[in-house]
């Protein structure tokens, strides 16, 4: 007889945890832009969701930002021959070791390898190099050969 209240209590707790987990990160907005010009016209750069200084031909941009904090995540593609235009945005190359990235799980376009505690050896094997941004509290991971970059707020 006493197992019924315990079971109901456990169910109520599980439901509360599920609801609370589902409501976390509700202030995170995601957006997609075909070109850098489109992102600029929408105000993504002026609002700080997208870093200033991306190469002019940057395309296929995905942006996520938290309205309740300064957290942000993004990815973009650029022509590899315009990589030199990206370098002023970046500081010195740093190690992946000790870095973490924890975007909300609902940001489905964010790579699995760039979630949680980062595995430097695996990431370097994919061609990614990591940099601290030269003028913001961002981390950038760039695959120069593929012309693809990712950025996120330092945790």
Question: Where do the PLM segments sit?
Answer:
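Mature extracytoplasmic domains of secretory-pathway proteins
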Residues: 52-121
């Amino acid at each position: 007889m006493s197992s019924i209240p315990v079971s109901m209590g456990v169910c109520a707790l599980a439901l509360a945890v599920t609801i609370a987990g589902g409501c976390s990160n509700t202030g995170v907005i995601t957006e997609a832009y075909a070109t850098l010009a489109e992102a600029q016209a929408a105000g993504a750069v002026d609002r700080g969701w997208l870093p200033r200084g991306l190469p002019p031909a940057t395309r296929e941009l995905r942006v996520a930002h938290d309205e309740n904090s300064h957290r942000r995540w993004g990815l973009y593609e650029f022509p590899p021959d315009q990589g030199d235009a990206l370098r002023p945005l970046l500081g010195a190359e740093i190690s992946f070791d000790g870095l973490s990235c924890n975007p909300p799980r609902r940001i489905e376009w964010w790579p699995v390898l760039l979630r949680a505690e980062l595995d430097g050896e695996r990431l370097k094997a994919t061609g990614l190099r990591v940099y601290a941004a030269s003028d913001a509290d961002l981390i950038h991971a760039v695959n120069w050969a593929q012309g693809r970059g990712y950025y996120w707020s330092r945790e």
